[in-house]
From Swiss-Prot:
Keywords: Aminoacyl-tRNA synthetase, ATP-binding, Cytoplasm, Ligase, Nucleotide-binding, Protein biosynthesis. Its EC number is 6.1.1.21. It is found in: Cytoplasm. This is Histidine--tRNA ligase. GO terms for cellular component: cytoplasm. The gene is hisS. Gene3D superfamilies: Anticodon-binding domain (3.40.50.800), Bira Bifunctional Protein, Domain 2 (3.30.930.10).
Length: 428
């Protein structure tokens, strides 16, 4: 029987997984410095969680969700995005209570699932890095979230990225805008795509996100939400923009930006990368915004919230082109070679001692000839080769060779007891 991975999935092999680990660790370190803590939620949830949060008319729910009935007759869905599960956990575990400091800031790094056409940077199983902040409706919470996204891309070495930003206002603004869109699109309904005709009666805002060719001719003249914003929404949006100006963060106010999920309210944003070697036009690598009603939607108290998500596959595609130096194989610190009776166990002890000091170290479990061990040390990219023979074992010594310049050092076993002492002797 020939077995293959399902279409739209990828094996992340060891030569690549280290690159993912480096990106994820960079994100973890940044988020922790901002006092965000990791949250882990199930990879599958009840179907209604996503259908209610993402919107019944969204592409995610209508076309892309993996859902099924389990053996207990429950309607289950694999998570297509990270926010809904985090909100569910926030409500179910009563994190809105007084025992938790607000804003409650979390991040996640997890696999998601959408039935999409596989292409470069987009798979049916994909990975997302995200942050969510619950409990503050202040404009600085929006600014902080945007800055976290900006600073993460900067730390990773992403080039030519641009912040696109818009606001959807509150529920009253959305309703007024909804009515204006219905009035605009209804006379040309028969000329719209099938999807847009269906969405016109349910959520015409989704039409603005359409990629269908027949819809494009009507989008440029469609009403703009900025013309329907109330004074409070305008004031809040202007505070965010003024803060970004003062902080030196450039942005583009994008009237066409609506985001693909129905739960957004207030500010929304995307970071787009302009790289013609990757895409014909600028493409989104990070997106998010404010969602002040989703906690209530899941029977929690009124709770403002804001967050963003990054598709890792797309991010890795960008970094492989723009910052390949980040992924250069650093090899390992030490490879222990040995020859002679009794040296095998000592090689194991030396490797364990080096690891306890924080170094990466490997020895030859196959105990091949010394020449073969040296070849392996070179193949794994060792910075130093430790040689241990019967004579060295008897004298309590070992030889260390620095491969970058061939310099050799004679060390006592006791030199391995202290990291600073060891480094002082081999980094001369």
């Amino acid at each position: 029987m020939r077995v293959q991975r399902p279409k739209g999935t990828v094996d992340i092999l060891p030569e690549t997984s280290g690159q993912w680990e480096k990106v994820e660790q960079t994100a973890r370190d940044l988020f922790k410095r901002a006092n965000y803590h990791e949250i882990r939620t199930p990879s599958f949830e009840n179907y209604e969680l996503f259908s209610r949060s993402s919107g019944e008319t969204s592409d995610v729910v209508e076309k892309e969700m993996y859902d099924f009935e389990d053996k207990g007759g429950r309607h289950i869905a694999l998570r297509p995005e990270g926010t809904a599960g985090v909100v569910r956990a926030y409500v179910e575990n009563k994190i809105y209570g007084p025992d938790y400091v607000k804003p409650f800031n979390v991040y996640y790094i997890a696999a998601m699932y959408r039935y999409e056409r596989p292409q470069a940077g987009r798979q049916r199983e994909f990975h997302q890095i995200g942050v969510e902040s619950f409990g503050s409706n202040g404009y600085l919470a929006d600014v902080e979230t945007i800055l976290l996204g900006h600073d993460l891309l900067a730390e990773l070495g992403v080039k030519n990225y641009e912040l696109h930003i818009n606001t959807l206002g509150d529920s009253e603004v959305r309703q007024a805008y909804h009515d204006a869109l219905v009035d605009y699109f209804t006379p040309v309904k028969d000329q719209l795509s099938e999807d847009s005709q269906r969405r016109l009666g349910k959520n015409p805002l989704r039409i603005l996100d359409s990629k269908a060719e027949e819809d494009q001719q009507f989008l440029s003249e469609a009403p703009k939400i900025r013309d329907y914003l109330d004074e409070e929404s305008k004031e809040n949006f202007n505070k965010i923009l003024a803060s970004l100006d003062k902080l030196g963060v450039k942005y583009v106010i994008d009237d066409d930006l609506v985001r693909g999920l129905d739960y957004y309210t207030g500010v929304i944003f995307e970071f787009m990368v302009d790289d013609p070697t990757l895409w014909a036009s600028p493409s989104t690598v990070l997106g998010g915004g404010r969602y002040n009603h989703l906690v209530e939607e899941f029977s929690g108290p009124e709770t403002p919230a804001v967050g963003f998500g990054i598709g890792e596959e797309r991010l890795m595609l960008v970094l492989s082109k723009q910052n390949p130096e980040m992924f250069e194989d650093q090899g390992i610190d030490f490879f222990i070679t040995n020859i002679g009776e009794g040296t095998d166990i000592k090689a194991v002890e030396v490797a364990r001692q080096l690891r306890s000091l924080g170094f990466s170290a490997q020895y030859d479990v196959d105990q091949k000839k010394l020449k073969a061990q040296f070849r392996k040390a070179d193949r794994v990219g060792a910075r130093y080769v430790v040689t241990l023979g019967a004579k060295e074992l008897a004298e309590g010594k070992l030889t260390v060779k620095r491969l970058s310049d061939g310099q050799q050092f004679s060390l006592e076993f006791t030199d391995l007891e202290d990291k600073a002492n060891l480094l002082s002797k081999i980094e001369k």
